[in-house]
Amino acid sequence: MGAVKNEDISYRGRRGPDRKDRSYARRSYARKIHCRTLSDGCDLLQPGAWDERIYRLLQWKERDTETGRKLAGGVRWEAGMQITDCSAYEILQKERIEDVHADGYLLRHKKSGARVMLLANQDENKVFNIIFRTPPADSTGVAHILEHSVLCGSREFPLKDPFVELVKGSLNTFLNAMTYPDKTMYPVASCNDQDFKNLMHVYMDAVFYPNIYEKEEIFRQEGWHYQLEQVDDPLKYNGVVYNEMKGAFSSSEEVLEREIFNVLFPDTPYGVESGGDPKCIPDLTYENFLAFHGKYYHPSNSYIFLYGNMDMAERLEWMDKEYLSKFDKITVDSQIAKQKPFEKTVEHKIFYPVGENDSEEENTYLTYSMVVGDGLDVKRCTAFEVLDYVLLSAPGAPLRQALLDAGIGKDVDGGYNDGIYQPFFTVEVKSAEEKDKEKFLQVIRETLEKLVKEGIDQKAIAAGINYLEFRFRESDYGSYPRGLMYSIDVCESWLYDDNKPFVHLEKLKAFDELKKEAGEGLFEQLIQETMLDNPHSAVVLGMPKKGLTTEEEKKTEEKLAAYKASLSREQLEKLVEKTRKLKEFQDSEDSAEAKAKIPMLKRSDIGKEALKIHNTPHHVTGNTVLHHNLDTNGITYLTLLFDTKQVQDELISYMGILKSVLGYVDTAHFTYGELFHEINAQSGGIGCGLQVFQGKDQKNDCIRMFGVKTKYLVQKEEFVFSMIREILFTSRLDDDKRLYEILSQQKARLQSSLAAAGHSTAVMRAASYYSPVSNFQDRIAGIGYFRLVEELEKHFEEKKEILKENLKKLMLLIFRPENLFVSVTTDE
């Protein structure tokens, strides 16, 4: 194909109840198929012929149909690892963690008190993560600013930005740092042994010996400073984190989520903004900044995580010799306190900014949130993930559908929010009105009471459990290293209870117990206890307000002007001088001597043998099947790619709607809710999406593909093909009510997502005028697409027939055998 660029655009695979991507699966099927819905007599679209054709495409080799094959998650590790020679550490716990196929160790460094977790297996993508509990006392953003600042040079690597140089000679697979509401982490990953050691060295030096004590300019650059280039200029605030958080506070969803935290947990670190509130960031002093590091960035407050195939004993010895042995154990008061339960539900309003051209009508967020326990009980946590699926996330979910049917807002979101000491569950409606608040709460209560009284659909529960178990066993995190995600998972218990470090890696028992107890009223009891009879809850409304940004900026300008007026000429000149010195610091070049200290990989450190990827093309019935032979732990990954070159220009944006409709409307034999549950109950999901490839002619050519992706165990292959056929050939595209619901949801989500990623949206739009790839992206996922969705939703009654006709045209143009390219990945 000559493809040099692959853009996977809004692929809606059913990856489950993640807060940013909800999608799931479907129901049992009958063999009797009537496909006149779309084919109108076209032989190419007869599903019977398609069944035979698809089967033939995938029968080009012998297949292992062993029904007893077990889906294994993670990387297998058969041999036990022995940690016997590390006298500097006390081994507190050792166990075989079968759920993730690893040997787990929990250690404590004797001299410094550092906690250390080892997960040893054969994964060559090694991960190191050092985590500190960093509970903020206010919203000055000190934890966030410190996360930026420690990476601006250290004792052994005194560059202004050592990581710019480091990545030039690194093969890292992950290199970053993250601030959470109660912790800060510094993870790295690499498949190369020497590279991994280099990364560990730079990160350990950064967190324990940063240059922040010698160079105040780092704090001023990364946090905040007064900017005054000339005495007569207006005084301004500036700083990396300050500007970053100004952007974050302009996002409606971030403003709302932040307020929910603040209202639910007013007496804990979750009640303030760890990232920093722009109004509060300038209150942070350099002295308090340094004190925060001195208090929390000590080995006694650290949680060190090592994962993968490495010489663990050697790494432990290195950490002891180079860093941990330099510190004595101290007591660090960083324990996260629990919020005292409320006696009654609290209510609060928060305003978020909208543009002058945006409407304040039908733009309110209604939310109801409940604290549902703590994160230490893995079975309970998993049960709430299932309830997320059952109540809200799955299409047709009863609480979601009840709110939509009541005409409250245009989209429903929310779900289970974990990753903190006290997880909570939120029901959120977008594009609503303030006057709908009481109706919103009434519908929630009536729907939940009905579910408790009549019982939850057991098929929905089974689908939710199977989906979550499939995802856990598969442990596929896309481009993120598996060990990185495990290091985040263990923090959900380890940081709050030293005796429960591995509980979120051992979930299979919880899944088994939930399957057994699902029919005994477990989930109904949880709803009654935590959602109906729980006073520790909050109703938070997010209200749009025009001119809010201008209003806030004016207040800031007036505050700065008043402060400037209070300064003497001499003080103003000092500010000018500090501004000049900061710019001089930023513009100065690191010395060659300093750059030379950054560890770089040598050729001898890199193996000569590249990782062999076996891609074997097969030509069957006139189509190409590309087989990838990889270790998939018994899972088949199948992608059907349909070339869309026959699609006329005026229909391109409608492809974005089509991929949002397929699988989310009724078919010949199922409601969309039934389909969704059945697919999740028996596979890893089916999803539709659009991909674009840069062609050989880099300037004027691109290849556009409509994809159908799925993953399943081999014994479920026939079922999966039947479900794909059900979706592609019997989808009901004439259900006006459902089409309008989907358009409304699309509009609400696009309004939030495009605004939240404004820079990316603008870049895509600008590039669309000269790049075919960007033009396609914009028309199916950007501003061009939003304009179509907005127009169709606004004038639905007038344009619904055009919409339905165009969707049917696309079905006929795209899903033709001659357009098909198959990619299949198996370990056989």
Predicted feature residues:
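His/Glu-rich zincin catalytic helix
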Residues: 74-163, 187-194, 201-204, 250, ...
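M16 family metallopeptidases and their MPP-like homologs
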Residues: 125-135, 161-209, 216-227, 254-279, ...
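Intrinsic disorder/low-complexity segments enriched in small, polar and charged residues
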Residues: 3, 12-16, 36, 51, ...
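Low-complexity, intrinsically disordered tandem-repeat tracts enriched in small/polar residues
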Residues: 16-18, 23-25, 30, 35, ...
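Intrinsic-disorder-associated, low-complexity terminal segments enriched in Asp/Asn/His/Tyr and depleted
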Residues: 8-11, 18-21, 34, 43, ...
